[in-house]
Amino acid sequence: MCIRDRHCYACPWAITICPIGLAQNLIVFGTVPYFWIGMIVAYGLAAGRGFCGWFCPFGTLNDLLSFRKVKIHRVASFSKFVILGGTLLAAWAFADTMFCKLCPVASLEASIPYVFLGVARVNRPFLVHMGTLAVTLAGMVLIARFWCRYLCPMGALLSLFNRASALQLNLNESLCTQCTACASACPMGIQPHTEHDDHNCIKCGRCVDGCHLGALTFRLRRLRRR
């Protein structure tokens, strides 16, 4: 789970940063990390939420734990934006990285490894982390990609680039018969045949594989010439 350059920077073996931790530190300390901001924007413009579907280790854990695919509720899916906004507001109000103290990803990738390494003790902050992790894991078991759909602020941040990213999910309407095979395959519970540019799409490609008519494909966005 704790991959050196892919997730929580509190992980004992991390060598880079968590964009949400980065955003909080930007607010708390006022130092602008231009390089990392540029990297996040560049990645967002390249693939949008593609990271969530292909590289995120916590997303992989979601897939391993859950076998249920429920239709996403549009209003509920915006909760991750509320969490993103609340995270930034809390960093400003308390001058601290408050979300990191609750983040279930940090629980799994930092708190538990540090206790096993003997660096940290089982104390109140550790138990709080275990509580948020337990709730999140329970949600993952009940709902496919529960964390990615409703809670992940990183997913909310990358989804802002989804419709503008170079990597796009394309629907050939002349081939589509509205059979909803793509919707049955989608772990995010969206309807790719009608919502192929949705902000919740993690571009995992399961809908492409599930469409036996070849109506869904990935393509690179073409730059418009004036």
Where are these regions (language model features)?
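Non-ligating segments of multi-cofactor redox enzymes
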Residues: 1-193, 199-226
